[in-house]
Protein backbone atom coordinates (compact mmCIF):
# COMPACT_ATOMS: atom_id res chain seq x y z
CA UNK A 1 0.00 0.00 0.00
CA UNK A 2 1.60 3.27 -1.05
CA UNK A 3 1.92 6.06 1.43
CA UNK A 4 -0.08 9.17 0.71
CA UNK A 5 2.16 12.16 0.20
CA UNK A 6 1.00 15.49 1.44
CA UNK A 7 1.69 18.53 -0.66
CA UNK A 8 3.93 21.15 0.91
CA UNK A 9 2.09 23.99 2.56
CA UNK A 10 2.06 27.15 0.52
CA UNK A 11 1.92 30.33 2.60
CA UNK A 12 -0.95 32.54 1.61
CA UNK A 13 -0.20 36.17 0.90
CA UNK A 14 -1.39 38.60 3.52
CA UNK A 15 -4.42 40.56 2.44
CA UNK A 16 -3.87 44.29 2.08
CA UNK A 17 -4.72 46.23 5.22
CA UNK A 18 -4.70 43.13 7.45
CA UNK A 19 -2.27 43.33 10.38
CA UNK A 20 -0.57 40.38 11.99
CA UNK A 21 -2.06 39.43 15.35
CA UNK A 22 0.35 40.52 18.09
CA UNK A 23 0.80 38.16 21.03
CA UNK A 24 1.08 39.37 24.60
CA UNK A 25 4.81 38.63 24.73
CA UNK A 26 5.55 40.57 21.54
CA UNK A 27 3.43 43.46 22.77
CA UNK A 28 5.37 43.52 26.04
CA UNK A 29 8.74 43.48 24.26
CA UNK A 30 7.62 46.21 21.89
CA UNK A 31 6.52 48.49 24.72
CA UNK A 32 9.72 47.77 26.59
CA UNK A 33 11.95 48.58 23.63
CA UNK A 34 10.11 51.82 22.87
CA UNK A 35 11.53 53.39 26.04
CA UNK A 36 15.34 53.78 25.98
CA UNK A 37 15.42 54.38 29.74
CA UNK A 38 13.77 51.00 30.29
CA UNK A 39 16.49 49.33 28.25
CA UNK A 40 19.14 51.24 30.20
CA UNK A 41 17.63 50.10 33.51
CA UNK A 42 17.53 46.50 32.34
CA UNK A 43 21.17 46.68 31.23
CA UNK A 44 22.25 48.09 34.60
CA UNK A 45 20.37 45.41 36.54
CA UNK A 46 21.72 42.65 34.29
CA UNK A 47 25.25 44.01 34.74
CA UNK A 48 24.93 43.88 38.53
CA UNK A 49 23.40 40.41 38.30
CA UNK A 50 26.39 39.21 36.28
CA UNK A 51 28.78 40.77 38.79
CA UNK A 52 26.95 38.99 41.62
CA UNK A 53 26.95 35.64 39.81
CA UNK A 54 30.60 35.92 38.75
CA UNK A 55 31.83 37.27 42.09
CA UNK A 56 34.01 34.18 42.80
CA UNK A 57 35.71 34.73 39.44
CA UNK A 58 36.03 38.51 39.59
CA UNK A 59 37.27 38.54 43.20
CA UNK A 60 38.71 35.30 44.53
CA UNK A 61 36.85 34.52 47.78
CA UNK A 62 38.54 34.22 51.13
CA UNK A 63 38.80 30.76 52.62
CA UNK A 64 36.82 31.17 55.83
CA UNK A 65 33.92 33.30 54.56
CA UNK A 66 33.61 34.71 51.04
CA UNK A 67 31.54 37.63 52.32
CA UNK A 68 34.29 38.86 54.66
CA UNK A 69 36.50 41.40 52.91
CA UNK A 70 40.23 40.58 53.03
CA UNK A 71 42.51 43.26 54.43
CA UNK A 72 46.26 43.65 54.07
CA UNK A 73 47.18 45.33 57.33
CA UNK A 74 45.79 47.49 60.10
CA UNK A 75 46.89 50.96 59.00
CA UNK A 76 44.28 53.58 59.78
CA UNK A 77 44.95 55.57 56.60
CA UNK A 78 43.07 54.44 53.46
CA UNK A 79 45.20 53.83 50.39
CA UNK A 80 44.34 55.17 46.92
CA UNK A 81 43.66 52.92 43.92
CA UNK A 82 46.77 51.12 42.74
CA UNK A 83 48.28 47.71 41.93
CA UNK A 84 46.58 44.98 43.94
CA UNK A 85 43.76 47.32 45.00
CA UNK A 86 42.16 48.82 41.85
CA UNK A 87 39.55 50.73 43.88
CA UNK A 88 41.79 51.49 46.86
CA UNK A 89 41.37 50.41 50.48
CA UNK A 90 39.41 51.62 53.48
CA UNK A 91 40.56 52.15 57.03
CA UNK A 92 42.35 49.00 58.27
CA UNK A 93 43.11 48.20 54.61
CA UNK A 94 39.89 46.46 53.56
CA UNK A 95 39.87 46.05 49.77
CA UNK A 96 37.20 48.23 48.15
CA UNK A 97 37.17 46.23 44.91
CA UNK A 98 36.39 42.99 46.75
CA UNK A 99 33.72 44.73 48.81
CA UNK A 100 32.00 46.22 45.75
CA UNK A 101 31.98 42.93 43.82
CA UNK A 102 30.72 40.74 46.66
CA UNK A 103 28.52 43.59 47.87
CA UNK A 104 26.51 43.19 44.65
CA UNK A 105 25.65 39.66 45.74
CA UNK A 106 24.75 40.92 49.22
CA UNK A 107 22.48 43.58 47.71
CA UNK A 108 20.56 41.05 45.61
CA UNK A 109 20.25 38.55 48.45
CA UNK A 110 19.00 41.12 50.95
CA UNK A 111 16.56 42.75 48.52
CA UNK A 112 15.15 39.44 47.28
CA UNK A 113 14.74 38.04 50.80
CA UNK A 114 12.94 41.17 51.98
CA UNK A 115 10.66 41.26 48.93
CA UNK A 116 9.90 37.53 49.20
CA UNK A 117 9.02 37.87 52.90
CA UNK A 118 6.85 40.93 52.29
CA UNK A 119 5.05 39.37 49.31
CA UNK A 120 4.33 36.09 51.11
CA UNK A 121 3.01 37.98 54.13
CA UNK A 122 0.87 40.16 51.87
CA UNK A 123 -0.51 37.16 49.99
CA UNK A 124 -1.72 35.67 53.26
CA UNK A 125 -2.99 38.74 55.10
CA UNK A 126 -4.05 40.74 52.05
CA UNK A 127 -6.02 37.81 50.62
CA UNK A 128 -7.90 37.21 53.86
CA UNK A 129 -8.52 40.91 54.37
CA UNK A 130 -9.63 41.75 50.84
CA UNK A 131 -11.61 38.61 50.02
CA UNK A 132 -13.53 38.08 53.25
CA UNK A 133 -13.74 41.62 54.59
CA UNK A 134 -15.55 42.15 57.88
CA UNK A 135 -13.68 41.78 61.19
CA UNK A 136 -10.67 40.15 59.52
CA UNK A 137 -10.29 43.12 57.19
CA UNK A 138 -10.67 45.58 60.04
CA UNK A 139 -8.06 43.80 62.17
CA UNK A 140 -5.47 43.53 59.40
CA UNK A 141 -5.92 47.15 58.33
CA UNK A 142 -5.55 48.49 61.87
CA UNK A 143 -2.35 46.49 62.31
CA UNK A 144 -0.95 47.89 59.07
CA UNK A 145 -1.94 51.40 60.18
CA UNK A 146 0.10 50.95 63.36
CA UNK A 147 3.21 49.87 61.45
CA UNK A 148 2.81 52.59 58.81
CA UNK A 149 2.55 55.25 61.53
CA UNK A 150 6.28 54.84 62.30
CA UNK A 151 9.01 56.22 60.02
CA UNK A 152 10.44 53.22 58.20
CA UNK A 153 14.14 53.73 58.93
CA UNK A 154 13.55 54.54 62.60
CA UNK A 155 11.40 51.42 63.02
CA UNK A 156 14.10 49.31 61.34
CA UNK A 157 16.78 50.81 63.61
CA UNK A 158 14.74 50.01 66.72
CA UNK A 159 14.10 46.42 65.62
CA UNK A 160 17.77 45.75 64.82
CA UNK A 161 18.84 47.39 68.08
CA UNK A 162 16.60 44.96 69.95
CA UNK A 163 17.50 41.84 67.92
CA UNK A 164 21.21 42.58 67.54
CA UNK A 165 23.53 43.40 64.65
CA UNK A 166 23.49 40.85 61.81
CA UNK A 167 22.44 40.57 58.19
CA UNK A 168 19.56 38.27 59.11
CA UNK A 169 18.18 40.66 61.73
CA UNK A 170 18.49 43.58 59.32
CA UNK A 171 16.50 41.62 56.73
CA UNK A 172 13.82 40.88 59.34
CA UNK A 173 13.66 44.54 60.33
CA UNK A 174 13.31 45.80 56.76
CA UNK A 175 10.69 43.13 55.98
CA UNK A 176 8.68 44.28 59.01
CA UNK A 177 8.81 47.80 57.61
CA UNK A 178 7.82 46.78 54.07
CA UNK A 179 5.05 44.18 54.47
CA UNK A 180 2.22 46.65 55.37
CA UNK A 181 2.60 48.46 52.03
CA UNK A 182 2.36 45.21 50.06
CA UNK A 183 -0.58 44.04 52.17
CA UNK A 184 -2.59 47.22 51.64
CA UNK A 185 -1.90 47.13 47.91
CA UNK A 186 -3.02 43.51 47.54
CA UNK A 187 -6.06 44.08 49.72
CA UNK A 188 -7.14 46.95 47.44
CA UNK A 189 -6.69 44.76 44.36
CA UNK A 190 -8.77 41.99 45.97
CA UNK A 191 -11.57 44.47 46.69
CA UNK A 192 -11.51 45.47 43.02
CA UNK A 193 -11.43 41.94 41.57
CA UNK A 194 -13.70 40.00 43.91
CA UNK A 195 -16.89 41.58 42.51
CA UNK A 196 -16.00 41.04 38.84
CA UNK A 197 -18.25 38.67 36.88
CA UNK A 198 -15.82 35.76 36.48
CA UNK A 199 -15.21 35.60 40.24
CA UNK A 200 -18.94 35.67 40.94
CA UNK A 201 -19.44 32.97 38.30
CA UNK A 202 -16.85 30.77 40.00
CA UNK A 203 -18.65 31.27 43.31
CA UNK A 204 -22.01 30.44 41.72
CA UNK A 205 -20.56 27.20 40.33
CA UNK A 206 -19.64 26.12 43.85
CA UNK A 207 -15.91 26.82 43.73
CA UNK A 208 -14.16 26.82 47.08
CA UNK A 209 -12.61 29.97 48.49
CA UNK A 210 -9.04 28.65 48.21
CA UNK A 211 -9.60 27.61 44.60
CA UNK A 212 -11.15 30.95 43.66
CA UNK A 213 -8.42 32.96 45.40
CA UNK A 214 -5.50 31.03 43.91
CA UNK A 215 -6.93 30.42 40.41
CA UNK A 216 -9.00 33.51 39.69
CA UNK A 217 -8.12 36.39 42.01
CA UNK A 218 -4.36 36.27 42.69
CA UNK A 219 -3.34 35.86 39.00
CA UNK A 220 -5.26 39.06 38.23
CA UNK A 221 -3.86 41.04 41.17
CA UNK A 222 -0.18 40.05 41.14
CA UNK A 223 1.06 42.57 38.55
CA UNK A 224 0.82 45.62 40.85
CA UNK A 225 2.81 43.61 43.40
CA UNK A 226 5.53 42.94 40.83
CA UNK A 227 5.67 46.62 39.92
CA UNK A 228 5.95 47.62 43.58
CA UNK A 229 8.62 44.98 44.22
CA UNK A 230 10.77 46.14 41.31
CA UNK A 231 10.47 49.77 42.39
CA UNK A 232 11.21 48.77 45.98
CA UNK A 233 14.42 46.82 45.35
CA UNK A 234 16.56 49.94 45.32
CA UNK A 235 14.94 51.39 48.43
CA UNK A 236 15.58 48.18 50.34
CA UNK A 237 19.29 48.31 49.46
CA UNK A 238 19.46 51.96 50.58
CA UNK A 239 17.84 51.07 53.91
CA UNK A 240 20.19 48.13 54.43
CA UNK A 241 23.19 50.32 53.54
CA UNK A 242 21.99 52.94 56.03
CA UNK A 243 21.71 50.31 58.77
CA UNK A 244 25.22 49.05 57.97
CA UNK A 245 26.59 52.59 57.97
CA UNK A 246 25.06 53.13 61.41
CA UNK A 247 26.67 49.92 62.65
CA UNK A 248 23.38 48.00 62.84
CA UNK A 249 23.38 45.98 59.62
CA UNK A 250 26.26 43.93 58.29
CA UNK A 251 29.06 43.20 60.78
CA UNK A 252 32.44 44.96 60.41
CA UNK A 253 34.35 43.75 57.36
CA UNK A 254 31.28 42.27 55.65
CA UNK A 255 30.97 42.78 51.88
CA UNK A 256 28.24 45.40 51.85
CA UNK A 257 28.29 48.82 50.25
CA UNK A 258 27.02 50.59 53.36
CA UNK A 259 29.62 48.79 55.45
CA UNK A 260 32.36 50.01 53.06
CA UNK A 261 31.34 53.62 53.73
CA UNK A 262 31.23 52.90 57.46
CA UNK A 263 34.78 51.51 57.41
CA UNK A 264 36.10 54.89 56.28
CA UNK A 265 33.59 57.27 57.82
CA UNK A 266 36.42 59.10 59.61
CA UNK A 267 38.03 59.96 56.26
CA UNK A 268 35.03 60.95 54.14
CA UNK A 269 35.74 64.66 54.66
CA UNK A 270 39.40 64.22 53.67
CA UNK A 271 42.09 66.28 55.35
CA UNK A 272 42.16 69.91 56.43
CA UNK A 273 44.06 70.96 53.32
CA UNK A 274 42.37 68.69 50.77
CA UNK A 275 38.80 67.45 51.36
CA UNK A 276 39.08 65.12 48.35
CA UNK A 277 42.15 63.21 49.55
CA UNK A 278 40.17 60.03 50.25
CA UNK A 279 37.45 60.54 47.64
CA UNK A 280 37.44 56.85 46.69
CA UNK A 281 36.24 55.74 50.14
CA UNK A 282 32.87 57.39 49.44
CA UNK A 283 32.66 57.61 45.64
CA UNK A 284 33.31 53.91 44.92
CA UNK A 285 30.61 52.33 47.17
CA UNK A 286 28.33 55.35 46.70
CA UNK A 287 28.43 54.93 42.92
CA UNK A 288 27.57 51.24 43.28
CA UNK A 289 24.53 52.11 45.41
CA UNK A 290 23.48 54.88 43.02
CA UNK A 291 23.67 52.71 39.90
CA UNK A 292 21.90 49.76 41.55
CA UNK A 293 19.02 51.96 42.71
CA UNK A 294 18.85 53.78 39.36
CA UNK A 295 18.70 50.51 37.42
CA UNK A 296 15.86 49.10 39.48
CA UNK A 297 13.91 52.37 39.43
CA UNK A 298 14.11 52.56 35.63
CA UNK A 299 13.16 48.90 35.33
CA UNK A 300 10.27 49.37 37.75
CA UNK A 301 8.98 52.30 35.70
CA UNK A 302 9.14 50.09 32.62
CA UNK A 303 7.12 47.36 34.32
CA UNK A 304 4.54 49.92 35.40
CA UNK A 305 4.21 51.27 31.86
CA UNK A 306 3.80 47.73 30.49
CA UNK A 307 1.45 46.19 33.04
CA UNK A 308 -0.58 49.15 34.30
CA UNK A 309 -3.89 49.06 32.35
CA UNK A 310 -4.50 52.75 33.06
CA UNK A 311 -1.32 53.66 31.16
CA UNK A 312 -1.69 51.18 28.31
CA UNK A 313 -4.53 53.05 26.71
CA UNK A 314 -2.47 56.22 26.40
CA UNK A 315 0.47 54.54 24.63
Regions found by a protein language model. Name each.
Residues 1-4, 313-315:
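Short, intrinsically disordered, low-complexity terminal/loop segments
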Residues 2-5, 51-89, 244-255:
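Hydrophobic alpha-helical transmembrane segments of membrane transport/permease proteins
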Residues 2-4, 13-65, 140-143, 221-222:
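N-terminal signal-anchor/first transmembrane alpha helix
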Residues 10-13, 58, 63, 68, ...:
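Intrinsically disordered, low-complexity segments enriched in proline/serine/threonine
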Residues 10-28, 82-95, 132, 210-215, ...:
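Short, membrane-interfacial amphipathic segments enriched in basic
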Residues 16-18, 64-66, 71-76, 185, ...:
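Intrinsically disordered, low-complexity segments enriched in polar/charged residues with Gly/Pro
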Residues 31, 58, 86-89, 162, ...:
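Residue-level signal for helical boundary/lining positions with a hydrophobic bias
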Residues 91-315:
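Alpha-helical transmembrane segments of integral membrane proteins
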Amino acid sequence: MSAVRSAPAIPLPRAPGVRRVETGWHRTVRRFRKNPLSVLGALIVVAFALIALLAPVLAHPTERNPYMIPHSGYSSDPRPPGPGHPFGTTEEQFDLYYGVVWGARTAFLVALMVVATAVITALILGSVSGYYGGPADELVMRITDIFLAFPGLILAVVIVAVLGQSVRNAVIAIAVVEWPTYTRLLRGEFLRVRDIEYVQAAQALGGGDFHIITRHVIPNTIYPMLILASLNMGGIVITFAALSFLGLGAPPGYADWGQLINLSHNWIAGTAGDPFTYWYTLIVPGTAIFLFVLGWNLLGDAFRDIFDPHLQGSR
